[in-house]
Structure formats: structure tokens, C-alpha cells
């Protein structure tokens, strides 16, 4: 019974962290690089001068869902971070079954500064 409770707490923590990241994504002004990539999203191409197109595609999706706002530009960053945390947690559980490694692996990933900043700022 203790393991499902730990998993629920881990998922609740991840949901709260994702909501915090979405709030920060909406509140922080866009960086010059993000504005540059937003321009890319207005004319999608299979590639750009110095980067592959994924950031432009993600910004295009976000701005079509939420409009041309800071949150629209950054929407998929925090959502992808949550998805990546879930995938890493499942991989850790598969690698070390029965040891509760999934929530620990996801927590360690989310504790890194670069992952936290990179999940809010939409740059490649």
C-alpha cells in the first residue's frame, strides 16, 4: 500500500511543478532568442540556418492553441519536461523493479538547474 501512495505523491509533485513552470512561462517576458524562434514559427520550414525545426514547430503549436503570448510560445516546454520526467521514471522502474527508483530518478532530473530553466525557456 505504501508504494502507490508514494507514486501518488510523486505525480502530485510533478503536476505542481509543471503548473509552476507554466505560470513562470506565462509571466516571464520572452528572451530575444525566443522571439527569433517565434518568427521562425510563422514560416515553417524543414530546417533553418543554424538549427533543426523542432522549436519552430512547437512554438507554432503553442501559439495556435493559446495565441501569440509568452505562454503560447513556451507551452510545450513545461509539458515536454513533465512527459520526459514520466518516461525517465518508468525507465528507472523497469531497470530497477520494485525499488521505487522511478520517483527518485524523476526528482533528480527535475532538481538540475539546466533542466528547470530549459523547461521554461523555449530555445533549442
Say what each PLM segment does.
Residues 6, 69-71, 95-104:
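Membrane-helix interface segments
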Residues 6-30:
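Transmembrane signal-anchor helices characteristic of membrane glycosylation enzymes that use polyprenol
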Residues 11, 75-96, 111:
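Transmembrane-helix motifs of polytopic, lipid-linked glycan transferases
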Residues 14, 105-113, 117:
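Short helix- or helix-capping micro-motifs
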Residues 26-37, 47-58, 67-71:
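Extracytoplasmic catalytic/substrate-binding loops of multi-pass membrane glycan-assembly enzymes
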Residues 53-57, 67-86, 102, 118:
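Loop-to-helix entry region of an early transmembrane alpha helix in multi-pass inner-membrane enzymes
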Residues 120-124:
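Short acidic/glycine- and proline-prone juxtamembrane loop motifs at membrane-interface regions
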Amino acid at each position: 500500500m505504501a508504494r502507490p501512495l508514494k507514486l501518488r505523491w510523486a505525480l502530485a509533485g510533478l503536476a505542481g511543478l509543471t503548473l509552476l513552470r507554466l505560470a513562470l512561462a506565462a509571466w516571464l517576458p520572452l528572451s530575444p532568442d525566443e522571439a527569433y524562434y517565434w518568427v521562425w514559427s510563422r514560416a515553417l520550414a524543414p530546417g533553418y540556418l543554424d538549427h533543426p525545426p523542432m522549436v519552430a514547430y512547437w512554438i507554432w503549436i503553442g501559439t495556435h492553441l493559446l495565441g501569440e503570448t509568452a505562454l503560447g510560445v513556451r507551452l510545450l516546454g513545461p509539458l515536454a519536461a513533465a512527459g520526459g520526467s514520466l518516461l525517465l521514471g518508468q525507465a528507472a522502474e523497469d531497470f530497477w523493479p520494485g525499488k521505487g527508483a522511478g520517483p527518485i530518478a524523476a526528482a533528480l532530473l527535475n532538481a538540475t538547474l539546466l533542466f528547470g530553466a530549459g523547461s521554461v525557456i523555449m530555445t533549442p
